[in-house]
Swiss-Prot record:
One of its GO terms (cellular component) is host cell perinuclear region of cytoplasm. This is Non-structural protein 1. Keywords: Host cytoplasm, Host-virus interaction, Inhibition of host innate immune response by virus, Inhibition of host interferon signaling pathway by virus, Interferon antiviral system evasion, Viral immunoevasion. GO terms for biological process: symbiont-mediated suppression of host innate immune response; symbiont-mediated suppression of host type I interferon-mediated signaling pathway. Plays a role in inhibition of the host innate immune system by counteracting the type I interferon signaling. It comes from Infectious salmon anemia virus (isolate Atlantic salmon/Norway/810/9/99).
Length: 256
């Protein structure tokens, strides 16, 4: 893998992040109205290592997205967008082992989150909540010391930390294309560490356009899927987003 760049656009913040993924690590730069100066791209983590993953190889692709350490604050223009961005956005062969290592000072944790932590896999709610709490206990200022999962077009984890201090461990499942639309459906589940409870499920629409992908988030109250089976595509009503959309101002816009 020779490496590639993608941009994360947030127009209302007046800027964007350019994320570079290479064989030796990742590089992040932020700039607003002005183009970045020489040397403005900094290593997100000197210890970060991504497995070699052939890009554009084969007919079947998996979409892997990791957003770690999204911290929202109002300190500066840069921090008002996000003060750190670590992630990967890759198309690769159907099964990919994707792991993070040494993302913080604590490196002794070895934590693996299941790819599909649905209720039926647990004997009771306490056991399910215990699983989430155990997984989140490994989190640090950055997210998880080590997080490993298998991406097969199924669930993959995304970490978000809001300015209110709540940790959200979001599992997203690709649920198939939406007939008659350029978008596809994902299911999401939130866990709010601050409130110590499992959050609501939501259904989201991911719009694909000429520039790339736009993630559009729905209110948690809007849920029409049975989890791992991916039946959301049968129930999705596109106007839900206009009526009940809770988005990060049209979400995160990715452009390869």
């Amino acid at each position: 893998m020779s490496g590639f760049n993608f941009e994360v656009m947030v127009p209302e913040q007046g800027g964007k992040v350019v994320f570079s993924l290479t064989e030796t690590g990742s590089c992040v730069s932020f700039y607003g109205d002005d183009e970045p100066g020489e040397g403005s791209c900094e290593l997100a983590s000197e210890n970060m290592d991504f497995p070699s993953c052939p890009l554009g190889n084969g007919d079947d692709f998996c979409l892997s997205l990791a957003l770690s350490t999204m911290r929202w604050s109002g300190m500066t223009k840069r921090n008002n967008f996000m003060d750190r961005f670590i992630g990967s956005f890759v198309h690769c062969t159907p099964v990919m082992i994707w792991s993070y290592g040494n993302l913080s000072k604590k490196s002794h944790h070895k934590m693996v989150c299941h790819t599909c932590p649905d209720e039926y896999k647990f004997s009771d709610k306490d056991e399910m909540q215990g699983y989430y709490e155990e997984c989140l206990e490994a989190s640090t200022d950055i997210f998880l010391d080590e997080l490993a999962t298998v991406v097969t077009g199924g669930f993959f984890p995304v970490g978000l930390k809001g300015s209110w201090g709540g940790w959200y461990l979001k599992y997203v499942r690709y649920a198939g294309p939406l007939a008659g639309s350029s978008g596809f459906i994902v299911n999401q589940r939130f866990y709010d560490r601050a409130q110590n409870k499992t959050g609501s499920r939501v259904v989201s629409m991911v719009e694909m356009d000429g520039d790339g992908l736009s993630f559009i988030y729905e209110k948690p109250s809007v849920y029409h899927s049975d989890g791992c089976t991916g039946s959301a595509a049968r129930f999705w009503k596109r106007d839900h987003n206009e009526r009940a959309g809770v988005e990060l101002r049209a979400g995160l816009h990715f452009r390869m």
